[in-house]
């Protein structure tokens, strides 16, 4: 089986001078994950993963999401909220958990596309994020820089790799088993919706945009033949220079851009992409295999070396880190823990249901945030909306890795670890979320709000979902 993609890269309804317009229906569909057995999925445009949106840097997009999902097996309405993960969106378009779209409603989201990176869109509806995403509500969204260095692989050699895992019953039904509101681990690894696929690759360099869209599972990626992975980008764009690593840890919500060069392999060579077990994740023999690359064809005439400096803007992360540290106005600490009496996951002992704010930096303020794993035997991938951050330190067994030293919005916090990050807050004022991206933890209720500045647009009332019917004008 070969890697396949849900749709072509450009499927917008129409364009104008600076905006691309899309319409996506959230609806039930079916997929053949087990041979000859149909599995019900909930997908954007009825597909898993959803349509790949490929945007040019600097062109705004408007995406109309229509909720046609109806009810679940317990006759509960399947409400949604869409978050474009990695976008500096205005509060009303950021996927605030309580800004829900019910079945029969739609909402138009406006995205700025002002940074070139591998993003993804997924459900963020309050207390339904995990099950909605597990059923399939996730898709890739790439913002490309037309002026990027030409020696970085492009076109057919620029490949999104959407990772997820599923547990299926014998009849093909997706089994959501959250271990007492702790985690969901499947025994089937999917790449772009396909279980353990094979991909034919030419004898040249490929850029793989890895995106972990799972619920709880992290991966420690490696090539079966021992060849190093060359990391060129993090969550929020290119690193300054390529970084080689033998293993690459990728938690839920994280993205890494990796170059693999197949030039020195003869046609017929097979190379497996594997994963080491992650501490405290439920592992199966089947989850140690991800996919296989099958080398085909003769030598490729044009296979230039990767540039030593990846970014055309000359951005210096070390200088930026020092500049931010010289402007720090305050430090904050956030302890991610577990209230076993209430069966809730907490941030500083509070939950989403408690309301209020966990922080209120002003627009332009530079702060250091310390994330503390409160223990209990779990790792937490911590996601902060709106801003890109730079990691400063991680204690315990696994120190900061060189491939993590770019702009990021998700930080993998190992069991018992503390992480320090620094960021300048903005560009928008308003309320945003931070949470654990183990989506079971998020739903039960490890998520808190912070507000940048004062007086920003309300994330719920400014642009609420509206009824969708035949009288709604098209985009």
Residue ranges and their predicted role:
Residues 1-90, 109, 114, 124, ...:
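A long-range scaffold signal marking pre-active-site subdomains of enzyme folds
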Residues 1-27, 134-164, 238-379, 424-431, ...:
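Extended terminal and domain-junction accessory segments
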Residues 33-54, 186-198, 339-366:
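N-terminal edge beta-strand
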Residues 34-35, 64, 68-98, 162, ...:
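Extracytoplasmic copper-binding redox domains, predominantly the cupredoxin/blue-copper superfamily
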Residues 44, 48-55, 61, 79-115, ...:
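Extracytoplasmic beta-sandwich strand-turn segments characteristic of Greek-key/jelly-roll folds
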Residues 89-101, 167-313:
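Histidine- and aromatic-rich segments of cupredoxin/plastocyanin-like copper-binding domains
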Residues 100-150:
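Long, hydrophobic, well-ordered secondary-structure blocks that form the structural core
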